[in-house]
């Protein structure tokens, strides 16, 4: 195999029935881009990779998300966004998170209580690296559904292990 082809993707997932869009979404918007309040039909986690994004929701009223931060918005939340600078982020949409470790999941449910004030979480270096890699993958072509499912499991594993 020639060296040039080793660095190029060999599989075209665009025609595959398992191809998927909309679960992990990489978005870039210029300063001033506004998204009026809209009800979330799924849970979502927003990971800010670059820039600042003003979030207005019941959980995060008037919260500025900065590079390296992330938040969870639940189903039914009304979410409004405003790019305060050029912004680059990833959104993970899901109804139920993939169940990675049932024991840890039950521990989290038993130990967690709703905070008085919600604050953004800071990405670990592992999640930051994961996000950079997933952005590269999403930029190549139509994502493979099976691969995205695995990456969503990996992402939830990282969140469950480190938060």
Regions found by a protein language model. Give the residues of each.
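N-terminal regulatory/effector-sensing and dimerization cores
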Residues: 18-112
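Aromatic/histidine-rich interaction motifs
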Residues: 104-131
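Short, charged N-terminal helix-start/capping segments
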Residues: 6-7, 11, 62-84, 122-139
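Residues at structural and domain junctions
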Residues: 31, 37, 120, 141-142
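General structural signal for secondary-structure boundaries
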Residues: 3, 12, 94-97, 124-128, ...
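An amphipathic alpha-helical interaction segment
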Residues: 121-163
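A short, N-terminal "cap"/entry segment at the start of jelly-roll beta-barrel domains
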Residues: 1-19, 118, 137-143
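Short, functional N-terminal and low-complexity linear motifs
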Residues: 12-14, 68-72, 96-103, 119-124, ...
């Amino acid at each position: 195999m020639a060296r040039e082809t080793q660095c190029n993707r060999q599989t075209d997932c665009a025609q595959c029935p398992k191809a998927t869009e909309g679960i992990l979404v990489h978005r870039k918007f210029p300063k001033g881009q506004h998204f009026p309040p809209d009800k979330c039909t799924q849970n979502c986690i927003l990971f800010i990779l670059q820039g600042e994004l003003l979030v207005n929701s019941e959980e995060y009223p008037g919260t500025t998300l900065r590079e390296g931060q992330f938040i969870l918005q639940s189903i039914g939340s009304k979410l409004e966004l405003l790019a305060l600078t050029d912004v680059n982020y990833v959104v993970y949409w899901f109804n139920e998170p993939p169940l990675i470790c049932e024991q840890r999941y039950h521990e989290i449910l038993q130990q967690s209580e709703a905070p008085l004030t919600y604050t953004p979480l800071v990405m670990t270096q592992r999640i930051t690296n994961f996000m950079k890699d997933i952005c590269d993958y999403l930029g190549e072509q139509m994502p493979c559904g099976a691969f995205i499912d695995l990456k969503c499991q990996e992402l939830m594993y990282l969140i469950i292990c480190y938060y």
